[in-house]
Amino acid sequence: DGPDDTGVQGDNLTNRSQPTFILKDVDPDAASVMVSVNHGGTTTTFAATNGAGGWRFTPASDWTDGAYTLSVTVTDKAGNVSHSAPLTVNVDTHVTIDSIVLVNDSSFIGDNLTNEVRPHFRVTVPGDVNVVRLSLNDGKTWGNATQSASGDWEYIWPDDVTEGKHTLTVEATDIAGNKATQMLEFIIDTTLSTPTITLDAVDDSGVAGDNITNEKTPGFTINGIDADASQVMVVVTHNGKSKELALTQVSGRWHFTPDSDWTDGNYTLTVKVEDKAGNMSQSSPLTVTVDTQTVISSIVLVNDSGIVGDKMTNNVHPHFRVTVPEDVNVVRLSIDGGTTWGNATQSAVKGIWNYNWPTDVGDGKYTLMVEAIDAAGNKATQTLEFIVDATLSVPTITLDTANDSGVAGDNITNEKTPGFTINGIDADAIRVAVQVTHNGTNQEVELTQIGGQWHFTPASNWVDGNYTLTVKVEDRAGNVSQSAPLAVTIDTQTEINNIVLV
């Protein structure tokens, strides 16, 4: 029957399980019209019915899918018998959609997530399917897939599909007219936030925001990670070598801390993120300097006034010069055990710092403390012992009593090599000299302490006349002092000019 020929007209293919057959050319005097049906090797005969539309045959029960061969036998009242040519009909009452695949699934295969705005679908159906169409709007509009050489049906969406979750409807129609519908949920995700990485404030040990740290295992906070991130990596580059480390979110936070100590130097960190859709994004690089130590190279007492390097000065405002690495930004000094500090000033040459004590420092021995702090917050402390000695006693020189041969204390002697006693010489004196002036000529003689006493005796006889002696003293701190001049007269002879009897 025409309505039951559900495929291509005349192909004798039907999706009806009880198809109706029209029997034609049956004479009016037919006494018996029988239909023989062969299916699966078994033949069953049924009586046709004659109604208003003529002779017809409809199975009394559903036929299963398969091929059926029908032949009609007509017997008229006179006993004549006639047979029709056999008719083979195929019953096909259903079709299936075997699979729907999102071809450009861009991340984990089978998660139906893509970062392509024009998704590509592959539909696998039985070979007798001749139409496959797809819709994203509940069947309001359809797109027809194309069969490939492999037999699968392909469809690439011709227009951009918006981000979000979508329901794909696929309808397959076979040549028997059967239809199958199946749906596939998929997600389009084409965007991924740009991550950021920052050095933890607690580890930014120098000036805030300078990304210099004295921590060997500094911590980094990572932000801008989307909830659908499937992989978060940190790439660390140091001395030309890069290392990639996978991160895991802990307690809702993304954080990175090296698993071993970093040596001093520069490190560049970049965060790379991939989401479930396969989108990728990376942060701007962050360069961090690890600086875990600093040193004080030298401390010099600039106005060391005695022997160079003995750290002794006669200046009550000692001047110190401190040499440190160029990244040091604070140098401070103390001579009271760190109770009070004075800040040094950096000179025009980086790494050289100077400090002049602003108030008088009394005589005595001191311990200078110097503290240097670099840009990373590292501290180095060093001490220097120094002495301030700004005083020197005034020496005295006297003619030995034994040689004061005239009136005691008149400093007139008849000794050609008179002796002189020198007092007021401090224990730290490093030079004691006697300057002798006679007839406009000066001679300076250095003395040595003997037996705990300072004494001077001319090395050769002095001729008669007047002599002026001055003692000059210098101590280790460079202080200089001299005695008041002592005038001595040498008179080794006398004469009787005449004798008169009065």
Where are the predicted features?
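Flexible, low-complexity linkers/stalks enriched in Thr/Pro that connect modular domains
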Residues: 1, 76, 85-103, 180-200, ...
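Short strand-edge motifs at loop-to-beta-strand transitions and within beta-strands
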Residues: 53-57, 151-155, 252-256, 351-355, ...
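Structural beta-strand segments of beta-rich domains
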Residues: 17-21, 117-121, 216-220, 316-320, ...
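Surface-exposed, short loops/turns at beta-strand junctions within beta-sandwich domains
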Residues: 59-67, 157-165, 258-266, 357-365, ...
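Short, solvent-exposed loop/edge segments of extracellular or virion-exposed proteins
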Residues: 1-14, 98-114, 196-213, 295-313, ...
